[in-house]
Amino acid sequence: MKFAVAIAFTLLVCVFAQEEEEPVTCGGKQCKPNSCCVQNSHGKGKDSPRCHPLGKLNNPCEVEPNENGIYSQHCPCGEGLSCTKVGEPNKLRCQEESGKSDKSKESQGSDESEESEESKESSG
């Protein structure tokens, strides 16, 4: 019985691992994790699709691929970054997600408010 449970658990872990990151097929090749498929449609002729790494801080980025899952110029941003309009003329760039820094400030603020409530209770 324990053996059957162990096998079931192992299969479940494998299924979840595969669901997390599907490899991207691009121009007949599979892209590595943390990359996307880009096909530059500008210029004299269309380039063949190629794998590119996900955007890093301040890199140009795109949010939506076309119907085939291919981006026209740039990959979306990597983990912890969001594609945000920056400067003039509002170009999209990878920026740190505002939620992360706000959350850390919020947690600091809640800690401070808890401390002040505790000090009121002990003094009052």
Swiss-Prot record:
Segments of this protein annotated with the region Disordered: 93-124
Biased composition (Acidic residues): 109-118
Keyword Transit peptide included in the entry's annotation: no
GO molecular function: toxin activity
Domain of life: Eukaryota
GO annotation, cellular component aspect: extracellular region
Comp. bias (Basic and acidic residues): 93-108
The protein's name: U33-theraphotoxin-Cg1c
